[in-house]
């Protein structure tokens, strides 16, 4: 005889949309259990319920806190579990804390039910959480095919819901020019992926949820009508923001004003705020690394630029002059010039920061005339000398009521190093959003793991803040399924505080039913270390934008050292062996699927490294020769090398397509098709035919800066 389902009454006020969402989520998962049945009730008065779960906002609780408290109802004598939070978002997070205790694993790729709910366990749960980080979330560049900017609206909404299920409470959307806002001057939105187009080739069409062009599926029909596409893009992002607000996320919007000064910059801000009234915080951020657009300046001229932009008083204590002196060396009798790899970042960063400070002050002063949300000044710079100088300028020039955001490095481990070098002070960090990485876009085509870097950042910030709550961390994120482990770790450590990676790996593997948890932990740790070596020794070897691979000659293929590729490849092989061993005794579907995906992606990584290594053979064939000067034998060698490399490209895409768990995986493979094979064909054409003009990449609406390697 089938056991009768236990009936639970859910009690909550109905005056808050986030609370209503919390009730729906709780009912959804309780009713999915074979042993439970849940209904909404106004108060615990009916005898037919076996117990009650009450959702309560506790205004006296610490900010951002949430908890679980068992008890009994005095009227009915029935057990009551109170899920409490400082606000409605906190209550929602208490709901997810409860559900995870009951046996659900929430991942960025979706929930996983790992065991049946036990009714009696409900009434023994007790927990109270003051998160280590106040504002916890994701930073979406919405700029590449593998992130949510290619998702259908239902898929994008579900992604947002999964962030809430990870108990995140913040999302930052970044828009490059021409992508997500239009302007009265006639510039349109809808130039997705920097304006680079991704027609779907026949070999990939069975795997892609578009007819002819890879983009948001609902917007594909607008492709030939630029104004219509622009409006559709804005409506799509507005709907995603609406979902974010419904699940309790703070919405931050980040924009680069570039050379739009004063009135032009204000018009952009006004337009964005008119298009997206749900924005809680507007961030004006400098371009990545100050861009290549500004000339390198000698130290004396740079001192003059600093004094011109921020006043001569910022130089008076000598600290900035000392930083400049340490960052430079003598290049002639009279001038110290910036010569290290990152020092060119400073002029552009200074000019844009100065402009943003003026605009922030003007926005604040005009609050009676316009609706102004919270404001932030963002800095995207990775050079340590630049960061040190900017930090000192912010100490005296940061407007009141304006927050700071820092994106200080490429890659999770490097963020902590940059903050240490920057010598951040406690006062600046008190209201500062730090951007780190779930994955680094420079290694997008490789399997990554950012757990160690995220953890070290938490540990550093906690220490530097004297163990007080950290203001905010948002993690850059593109691919979903491939990076769910790092995203899970990030979400947990931002709540609990620093967690030892090994402890996390073993617990996470156990929850998924992976058999050999110590071996899984070893595999993930080695993957993390190998990923960091790639970033340090093979910079941007997995970058996903064609123009950055090709400079009119061999591009990146002319820079990589084959021996380094060989060394890294051997490390990835070791990682793969560990994961394959884990698969042997893993019987659960959840664990097997997880291991199968990561093994596939490491195999793809090895194929990609093979391709790049083959292409480096051209260094000896034509690396020192101008196009159009090769002998017939050399041209034959170019064709042979490129043909072999293209074979590896086909193998990569074929293997990747064996497991496509989400839209981001589709985006990765279509991006690969239009990046590496395209560049290889251009190189082959250039050196075999000598046709330089025809081999130049297509122009785009915008492009990421080509990183130095």
Question: Model-derived features: where do they sit?
Answer:
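Hydrophobic, small-residue-rich alpha-helical packing segments that form membrane-like cores
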Residues: 243-250, 261-336, 349, 353
